[in-house]
Amino acid sequence: MDKPDTTLKIRTLGRFSIYVDGKLFTTDWPSETVQQFFCSLLSPLDLYITWDRLCRSTLETPVSPTARRGLEELYIMPLNTFLIKEFGFNPLIASDKGIGINHSRIDLDAFNFNSTVLDGLKLLSLGSQQAAFDKFNKAKELYSGSYLPGMPGKIIANTRKELDSIYRIANKAVIDEV
């Protein structure tokens, strides 16, 4: 059952919380591993995460038909069922290459932060210093802490490290401007 008006606001910087149409989502996840898998897919560093990367990070094996089936059975099917039941739609997009999140109905703080810093770097490379520093200041406002603090997982840990590094770049640019 698709609820076309449902929107999600997902906070991953400094904490993990989901708001459904403005209300805090408090239902229990099917399992910690399904929640962790979903959070891995929220990484703003890639449009999608390849099947090989997912298999290696969650099952610790290269992609194969058996590994893909394992991902489907252990993570994707329970997650799809949960998302449709709780949110009224499934924001996952799967292809032959991998799986990602459809951002059209999701406001994801880490995605907004990452995009804002990248826009600032692009503006800086084009010589638009003031516009770039405005973007970096906006990014500083968006960054409310480390990505999914305390949440385990290889993709999450790599994303956390990368976003912390990007934050330091934006912060240094703002400090250097002052």
Locate predicted features.
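Intrinsically disordered, low-complexity protein-interaction/activation regions
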Residues: 1-178
